[in-house]
Amino acid sequence: MIGKEVTVQDFTLELSELQPEVLPVDLLCEEELPNEQETEEESDIDRTVFKIIAPCGCSSCEVNLRIFVNATDTGIRTLQDLLISDLQLLCPECRGNCKHGGF
């Protein structure tokens, strides 16, 4: 660079000197577009509305919580496993008594 201001002439770009793994790649060259039948199959995933009644996770509360979800069979089973093992729902009153990150 000569002078106080940068000009386009100050930059020289030598793409031929780049390593093969750094060279630009046409991102569409290896892409396969799904046909219409595959697209329809993806949109036809069966979802069902479920009503879930679960007790509040706080030991001193006796409130039953009711939530509604729209899920696949796999999704509702995963949620059921979480509710049985690691996940506990809290009512708004018990949530107000909790601190962020724990009780």
Curated annotation (Swiss-Prot):
Superkingdom of source: Viruses
One GO MF term: DNA-binding transcription factor activity
Taxonomic lineage: Viruses, Monodnaviria, Shotokuvirae, Cossaviricota, Papovaviricetes
Subunit and interaction comment: Homodimer. Homooligomer. Interacts with host RB1; this interaction induces dissociation of RB1-E2F1 complex thereby disrupting RB1 activity. Interacts with host EP300; this interaction represses EP300 transcriptional activity. Interacts with protein E2; this interaction inhibits E7 oncogenic activity. Interacts with host TMEM173/STING; this interaction impairs the ability of TMEM173/STING to sense cytosolic DNA and promote the production of type I interferon (IFN-alpha and IFN-beta).
Residue intervals of every unnamed zinc finger in the record: 56-94
Gene this chain is encoded by: E7
Transcription regulation keyword on record: yes
Keyword vocabulary terms for this entry: Activator, DNA-binding, Early protein, G1/S host cell cycle checkpoint dysregulation by virus, Host cytoplasm, Host nucleus, Host-virus interaction, Inhibition of host innate immune response by virus, Inhibition of host interferon signaling pathway by virus, Interferon antiviral system evasion, Metal-binding, Modulation of host cell cycle by virus, Oncogene, Transcription, Transcription regulation, Viral immunoevasion, Zinc, Zinc-finger
Residue window of motif Nuclear export signal: 76-84
Subcellular location: Host cytoplasm; Host nucleus
Residue span of region E7 terminal domain: 1-47
Protein's name in the database: Protein E7
Role: Plays a role in viral genome replication by driving entry of quiescent cells into the cell cycle. Stimulation of progression from G1 to S phase allows the virus to efficiently use the cellular DNA replicating machinery to achieve viral genome replication. E7 protein has both transforming and trans-activating activities. Induces the disassembly of the E2F1 transcription factor from RB1, with subsequent transcriptional activation of E2F1-regulated S-phase genes. Interferes with host histone deacetylation mediated by HDAC1 and HDAC2, leading to transcription activation.
Comment field on protein domains: The E7 terminal domain is an intrinsically disordered domain, whose flexibility and conformational transitions confer target adaptability to the oncoprotein. It allows adaptation to a variety of protein targets and exposes the PEST degradation sequence that regulates its turnover in the cell.
Post-translational modification comment from the UniProt entry: Highly phosphorylated.
Membership in a protein family: Belongs to the papillomaviridae E7 protein family.
Biological processes, Gene Ontology terms: DNA-templated transcription; symbiont-mediated perturbation of host cell cycle G1/S transition checkpoint; symbiont-mediated suppression of host innate immune response; symbiont-mediated suppression of host type I interferon-mediated signaling pathway
